């Protein structure tokens, strides 16, 4: 199994990307990793090249680049070359912490979309209070969605939760403004009806306030609503940890209490760190494409590689294709 990685994408590239990739190559004996990027910048951080190769690419798609134009014009960029490795069959999956829009464009134009999937969906796995987490899609690949798209998202999320996360019968929830069957706009009402007709374990509408309670294993939404919910969760978590830090450093007594609570607080922070689940999978493409967070460190890249490896090993893409054929 070979996993291609854009070594130049992300805030901490290439150092953290290379460190995470090297750790994964050392940990998983059944994978090879291809790092794509400026070889002169990659090599200083690569201590052990066992099962790791480098493809030199002298262009980088920047965060400020217009996604589609960048993919079309920067043919020798690390991201485009990475996607080409997958398209040509030399890599089984790919990972980038770079420009999200450009990665989606490279996924669509280079890797290609699964026949029968109308639109891809960006799907991170987010933490829940019970420690199990849930798959959330779409969080921004497409701002709008038709009811049929939401039904496809549910199918892809179901396959991922079952094949990779080991959930025998994943609970599917539809993000809405209330839990009653007739809540929402025409899109969510129609999507609700379509999901009820499937063989999926559809539990109905779920509200944003219940997501971290573990109300569902897979939650589907249009990209606009999903992205707003995701950013709200991220912002709330950051604000709470910041407030907690201020409180626990406000006095000598508070600092003593913080010292006593440090192991518990560290465990809480780790539990709510969704980089432990890997990156956001771009579902609907012909191979696993993983979007790692732009601020990814070596640990996040390691888990993104683990995630890509599990998607390939469990044939998530093949299973999605088979399910589409079965239900068409």
UniProtKB/Swiss-Prot annotation:
It is an enzyme of class 2 (transferase). GO terms for biological process: fatty acid biosynthetic process; phospholipid biosynthetic process. One of its GO terms (cellular component) is cytoplasm. GO terms for molecular function: phosphate:acyl-[acyl carrier protein] acyltransferase activity. Gene3D superfamilies: Isopropylmalate Dehydrogenase. Its EC number is 2.3.1.274. It is found in: Cytoplasm. Pfam families: FA_synthesis. The keyword Transferase applies. It catalyses: a fatty acyl-[ACP] + phosphate = an acyl phosphate + holo-[ACP]. Belongs to the PlsX family. Homodimer. Probably interacts with PlsY. Catalyzes the reversible formation of acyl-phosphate (acyl-PO(4)) from acyl-[acyl-carrier-protein] (acyl-ACP). This enzyme utilizes acyl-ACP as fatty acyl donor, but not acyl-CoA. PANTHER family: FATTY ACID/PHOSPHOLIPID SYNTHESIS PROTEIN PLSX, PHOSPHATE ACYLTRANSFERASE. This is Phosphate acyltransferase. It comes from Geobacillus thermodenitrificans (strain NG80-2).
């Amino acid at each position: 199994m070979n996993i291609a990685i854009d070594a130049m994408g992300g805030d901490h590239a290439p150092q953290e990307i290379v460190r995470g990739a090297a750790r994964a190559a050392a940990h998983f004996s059944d994978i090879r990793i291809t790092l794509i990027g400026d070889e002169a910048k990659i090599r200083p951080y690569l201590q052990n090249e066992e099962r790791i190769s480098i493809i030199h690419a002298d262009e980088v798609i920047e965060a400020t680049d217009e996604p589609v134009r960048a993919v079309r014009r920067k043919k020798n960029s690390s991201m485009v070359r990475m996607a080409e490795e997958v398209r040509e069959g030399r890599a089984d999956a790919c990972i980038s912490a770079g420009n999200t829009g450009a990665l989606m464009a490279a996924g669509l134009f280079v890797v290609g979309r699964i026949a029968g999937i109308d639109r891809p969906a960006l799907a991170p796995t987010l933490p829940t209070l019970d420690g199990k987490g849930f798959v959330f899609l779409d969080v921004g690949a497409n701002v709008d969605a038709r009811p049929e798209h939401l039904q496809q998202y549910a199918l892809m999320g179901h396959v991922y939760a079952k094949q990779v996360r080991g959930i025998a019968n994943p609970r599917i929830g539809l993000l809405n403004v209330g839990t009653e069957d007739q809540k929402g706009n025409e899109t969510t009402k129609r999507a609700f009806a379509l999901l009820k007709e499937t063989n999926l374990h559809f539990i109905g509408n779920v509200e944003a306030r219940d997501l971290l309670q573990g109300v569902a294993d897979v939650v589907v939404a249009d990209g606009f609503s999903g992205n707003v919910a995701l950013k709200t969760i991220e912002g709330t978590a950051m604000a709470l940890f910041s407030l907690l830090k201020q409180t626990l450093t406000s006095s000598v007594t508070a600092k003593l209490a913080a010292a006593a609570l440090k192991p518990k607080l560290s465990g809480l922070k780790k539990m709510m760190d969704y980089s432990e689940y890997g990156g956001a999978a771009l579902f609907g493409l012909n191979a696993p494409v993983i979007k790692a967070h732009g601020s990814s460190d070596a640990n996040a890249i390691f888990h993104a590689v683990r995630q890509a490896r599990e998607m390939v090993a469990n044939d998530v893409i093949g299973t999605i294709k088979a399910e589409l054929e079965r239900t068409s």
